UniProtKB/Swiss-Prot annotation:
It comes from Haemophilus influenzae. It is found in: Periplasm. The keyword ATP-binding does not apply. One of its GO terms (biological process) is chaperone-mediated protein folding. This is Chaperone protein HifB. The gene is hifB. SUPFAM superfamilies: PapD-like (SSF49354), Periplasmic chaperone C-domain (SSF49584). Residues 1-27 form the signal peptide. Keywords: Chaperone, Fimbrium biogenesis, Immunoglobulin domain, Periplasm, Signal. Belongs to the periplasmic pilus chaperone family.
Length: 241
């Protein structure tokens, strides 16, 4: 199983409307340290670190949404604020963004809540020499989107122990994954007789999902893979009930 990567949505814009020929610029300069954000309840804030390994400075915009990837950042309402929401990251340098829970709306205290951290990396405009040579160009602003889990303080079950509490049941359509824990289980793979199941996805707390597989019977051995708190692949075995 390969590492999962967070989704990147490409947002296109043009500085000069291109005609027949158009120079192309597509560089993801700014990198986010980590692949997910865990926000423990009661903590004053959490820090997201950025690194710009490019030779040019970059402008970034950050915001949090509650599950709609198409939501306009100006109108997205979540109980978090990011400081600063817009920042210039100098070449070969880093930048820290501070996420603070405002408590503007009550969240469940018996399970995790899921939000998404967004970062839009806007590349710098080409210099005069580039424009003189190409005349027109197209830039791509790269948007990175990471899961942000708000974790209540009263959850006594360790998240790694919770992985072992999930029950897998044989069904005519495949495997029913029954997650009766307070944590999101971000599955990326399930093997039955060395064959990968389909429709493998994240399963929310106290909910179920069916992973499609053929011929699964009670007593069959299964192997699952999910992404843990550290962004690493976590493997485990289970017996279908």
């Amino acid at each position: 199983m390969g590492k999962t990567m967070f989704k990147k949505t490409l947002l296109f814009f043009t500085a000069l409307f291109f005609t027949a020929l158009c120079a192309f610029s597509a560089n993801a300069n700014v990198i986010i340290t980590g692949t997910r954000v865990i926000y423990p309840a009661g903590q004053k804030n959490v820090i997201v670190k950025l690194e710009n390994n490019d030779d040019s400075a970059a402008l970034v915009q950050a915001w949090i949404d509650n599950g709609n990837p198409n939501a306009d950042p100006k109108y997205t309402k979540t109980p978090f604020v990011i400081t600063p929401p817009v920042a210039r990251v100098e070449a070969k340098s880093g930048q820290s963004l501070r996420i603070t829970f405002t408590g503007g709306e009550p969240l469940p205290d018996d399970r995790e809540s899921l939000f998404y951290f967004n970062l839009l990396d806007i590349p710098p405009k080409p210099d005069a020499e580039f424009l003189a040579k190409h005349g027109s160009f197209m830039q791509i602003a790269i948007r990175s989107r990471l899961k942000l889990f708000y974790r209540p303080a009263k959850l006594s079950l360790d998240p790694f122990d919770a992985m072992k509490k999930v029950v897998f049941k044989a069904t005519p359509k495949g495997v029913l994954v029954d997650n009766q824990t307070p944590y999101y289980m971000n599955y990326i793979g399930l093997l039955h007789q060395n064959k990968p199941a389909k429709n493998v996805k994240m399963v929310a707390p106290f909910s179920q999902a069916v992973f499609e597989a053929k011929g699964v019977r009670s007593g069959d051995k299964l192997k699952w893979v999910l992404v843990n708190d550290y962004g690493a692949d976590q493997e485990g075995d289970a017996i279908a009930q």
